[in-house]
């Protein structure tokens, strides 16, 4: 009996022990984005606690290079790979990892049969909150500018939801659906594109709102509006992510009124937890795992 009890204790201890992985590779083309930086921060913190050696690779906007980096990781026989990119664009690399038996986990990436799971925020819900906020603030009428990025699934779905909501208000007109250059983060090009839109709509009050699928374009639009001296027109700006710059802008009480706080660090930590489960050989039933979010306005930005 004593031997059985000792064996049981050892079994429980083993199941709760850290997963000692030789190496985990994290690959992203979007490290210039503040949100991605926080994903990585959370992942690395949890990975270190588990005794892993996380290797973070930034391809600096080069999607094709992600495939090569996955192949390199497979050659090195890493224990797991984490991606932060549209899996549909890198299927060749994912197939190589699958063939090698190396689990690949998405960190705010998008879903794919070649992934164990994707850990992210609920983009549908976030877009619904911010687009409904805009519709209510402008009382269901006026011209709206949208900033989208359909090349990346977690952001693409936000635009789809906003399209549907604005389309349900007969007196709301989406006058432009802008896809900014995100190679430098997205603020500069969003600002330039918003400047052009303002120039094409010079009448005061001609633009009611700017809806952005993430904060960087919203911040760029804010700069353009303020520089044009049109901040007093009451143009409502919303974003998604609630990064520090966005929070500061919301707290300032100007045109940038709302964003959604994603738990970026929490997504990173949750991703590490799913990696641990995958390495142990556990079957992950959920193709998508959502981490909760919070709408941020002037009412709660200081909390």
Which residue stretches match the model-derived regions?
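C-terminal segment of classical bacterial N-terminal signal peptides
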Residues: 4-18
